């Protein structure tokens, strides 16, 4: 394939309404997460959890300190910005967010993410946002931080096609950042041709398939709402408002289990 993936980046840029120069593609979002963490070499990283365990596994390989900020169940796993900012240690230099989050299916709205990026920018904290599930959100524009990457250079948004496009075997992910210096560092350390030609070809077709995108979103949003309301009406369960394609449920009846 084209070593620079010029055509693919152009298609992604049109899909995300962003400059192709801000895009890096990789062998799944996992490769890009690993690259970002290894290149940032964070002395102290903060992970908002509970969340995907791969972040901490990659962080452990760099030898830095890993800290956690846990979302609170009594707030329905929605982030309390005031408490979050107050509890953040001064020496944190990398913040990792999954948005919408796995496994809580909660989400940080774009307006709150802007406050987070401003707060972090003032403290030289780089932010990684994993948006693997964002295309399932009821309103993508309300959640995605891609529009903020032009304004802030202390952030990289990472996405993949495994979930929304049901194509985990392609191993295709992409990242977006306006930090050209960091982007160059990623490209220098990334293996050449890390994305195979089949994935590059399929990626271009995926992002242009408006029919699939609309049909899938309509189905997921409709079924999610139906399931959420049904579970809410069951006294033995408590469901938390979902933004992804899954619902976190607490079992309230002691005699019941998840099996």
Which residues are covered by each model-predicted region?
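Conserved C-terminal alpha-helix-loop-beta "cap" of PLP-dependent enzymes
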Residues: 232-238, 246-259
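Short loop-beta-helix segment that forms the pyridoxal 5′-phosphate
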Residues: 13-35
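PLP-dependent aminotransferase class I/II
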Residues: 4, 154-233, 237-240
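Active-site pre-lysine segment of PLP-dependent enzymes
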Residues: 78-91, 103-127, 131-164
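Short beta-strands and strand-loop turn motifs
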Residues: 67-70, 94-101, 127-131, 240-242
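Short glycine-rich anion-binding loops that position phosphate/pyrophosphate groups of nucleotides
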Residues: 29-30, 52, 99-103, 133-134, ...
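A structural motif shared across PLP-dependent enzymes of the aminotransferase-like
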Residues: 1-11, 27, 100, 195
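PLP-dependent aminotransferase-like
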Residues: 6, 10, 31, 38-97
């Amino acid at each position: 394939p084209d070593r620079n993936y010029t055509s693919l980046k152009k298609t992604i840029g049109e899909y995300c309404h962003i400059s192709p120069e801000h895009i890096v593609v990789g062998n799944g979002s996992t490769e890009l997460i690993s690259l970002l963490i290894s290149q940032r070499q964070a002395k102290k990283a903060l992970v908002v959890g509970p969340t995907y365990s791969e972040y901490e596994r990659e962080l452990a390989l760099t030898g830095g300190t890993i800290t956690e900020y846990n979302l609170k169940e009594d707030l329905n796993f929605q982030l309390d910005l005031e408490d979050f900012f107050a509890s953040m240690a001064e020496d944190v230099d990398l913040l990792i967010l999954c948005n919408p989050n796995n496994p809580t299916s909660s989400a940080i709205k774009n307006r709150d993410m802007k406050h987070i990026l401003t707060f972090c920018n003032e403290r030289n904290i780089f932010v990684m946002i994993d948006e693997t599930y964002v295309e399932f959100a009821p309103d993508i524009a309300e959640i995605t931080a891609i529009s903020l990457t032009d304004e802030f250079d202390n952030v990289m948004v990472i996405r993949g096609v495994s979930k929304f496009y049901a194509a985990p075997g392609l191993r295709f992910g992409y990242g977006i950042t306006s930090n050209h210096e960091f982007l160059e560092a990623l490209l220098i350390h990334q293996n050449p041709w890390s994305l195979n030609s089949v994935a590059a070809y399929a990626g271009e077709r995926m992002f242009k398939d408006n029919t699939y995108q609309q049909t899938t979103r309509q189905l997921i949003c409709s079924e999610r709402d139906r399931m959420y309301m049904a579970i809410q009406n069951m006294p033995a369960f408590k469901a938390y408002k979902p933004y992804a394609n899954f619902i976190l449920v607490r079992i309230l009846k002691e005699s019941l289990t998840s099996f």
